[in-house]
Amino acid sequence: MLIMSSIKELYHAVSINDRFSVVNILEKKNIPIDYINFHPDNPLLEAVKLTNTDMIKTLLDYGICINTRDILGNTALHLIAMDYYVPHNDIKHGHHNDYVFKMVPIINLFLRKKANINACNNLNQTPLHLAAESNNTTLLKILLYNNAKVNILDIYGNTCLHYAVRGRNIESIKLLLSYNVDVNIRNFTYWYSALHEAVQIGDSKISRCIVSLLLCNKANVNTRCRLNTTPIFYAINCIDTLKLLLENGADINATSDNDNAVIHLATENRRYDIIKTLLDYGADVNMIGYRGKTPLYYATENYSYRNMKLLLDHGSNPNIADHIMNTPLFISIKCTCIENTKMLLDSGADINHVNDNGETPISYLAPNLIPTPVAILVISHIVLLKTKYNHIKYLPGFIKNISVIQNFTKFNNIKKVCEDEFRFMRSVSLSANHNLSSYICNDNLHTLVRFIKNPKIYYSINKIRIYRNRLYSIIERLLNRKKLHDLVLELIKDIGVFNKLPLDIISMILDFLSDDDLALMAIFN
């Protein structure tokens, strides 16, 4: 008890900077040094916290162990690295250089006395780990210059580089990289490399800067963590970092344990800008992910018209089914999204597709759950397909759809109106071989441009309800084409071989060209 009391007395004397009492206690009370070294109230560590160089020298001169530790296993160098001696507000605002420079003589004193610069605390952290974490570049430089080991792992497998990256400490990162720290070591918890950590930094400028530093020092851009994900998976919140990874060889179609690629993740999180960037860099728009879902499937689940359009414009196949053979159209109709459903149908989604349970997109739900606008859109499409393609009526999905329609009065009434409108359109003759329904049923619309100003069309359209908007859309497109057609005809009729041909023949030739081809001819002539 007397020894313990004396140690506490010594500790108190150090804390109030009473050097006379310290010397007196050490000389007269015969306290065994080992007791002091292992006591929780360690006078040397207290002197370090107080940045009291003279007191530190005094204690060391009297034999206090230079590598003495606190209950957490921290030595004096650990405490210096953690900025224990800096007021909290100064650390918070980054104004602690003056305090750090005060410690340089103390640090040098410890190094002259052969302090263990690679000592590990209870978490297996060295002073280098903690200096990197607190961005104590002064201590970091001194430790590195004195051959501190840069690749020691803490109990979680983190190197000092992991700490510096998490702390967003760019200067510390540069220092460590200049001393050949291994940039590709992965920790034990998530198997994160420093690059995994860097791409998850919220600030895009800092993230890009750190990622660039790591990549310049041969960081593996495709290293995988415990979830089998590469750093690119964590860059979906920072487009600049994403581009940097892609420009340095990141595998854009790499998949995780659940088979999803980055484009699935971006679509699931409704990130239009990221999806567009991935597509611009060559991501597979039809990549099969978790449970057979494509990016379009996720976009449909998220009611995201904009993302769906982007994917479809880049060639997404709307008929790729998931693990139970549901296509995005099943989801769109289930969600009663009329705009999304229309876009899928216009892009070639198969309304007669049958899933593993023998259901089609409209039999998938109870008929009374499908809103009237969606029902009109879908049933009018089915009637259109039946009119255009005779073989459709033999398909199991079509037979199932017709059965659902006929067994539900509202659906059957819609079907009858659609069929009546087709009969009416066929009665509006435009030529010996063409009638108003040709604008909906004919896949080669270019040949119909010649009839576009026939007054019968505009008079008759007003009598049509369900297919009116479809007709107006087609006619508007053809009117624009006619303007382009007539412009090109005027430009080329007197050029080369064309001046020897009748205008009707030239016009027929132009009918076989696409709108894009006509536009190019108009530009270059």
From Swiss-Prot:
ANK repeats lie at residues 39-71, 72-122, 123-152, 156-185, 190-226, 227-254, 258-287, 291-320, 324-353. InterPro entries: Ankyrin_rpt (IPR002110), Ankyrin_rpt-contain_sf (IPR036770), PRANC_domain (IPR018272). Coiled coil: none annotated. It comes from Fowlpox virus (strain NVSL). PROSITE patterns: ANK_REP_REGION, ANK_REPEAT. Keywords: ANK repeat, Repeat. It holds the Pfam family PRANC. It comes from the Viruses. The keyword Hydrolase does not apply. The keyword Repeat applies. This is Putative ankyrin repeat protein FPV228. Gene3D superfamilies: Ankyrin repeat-containing domain (1.25.40.20).
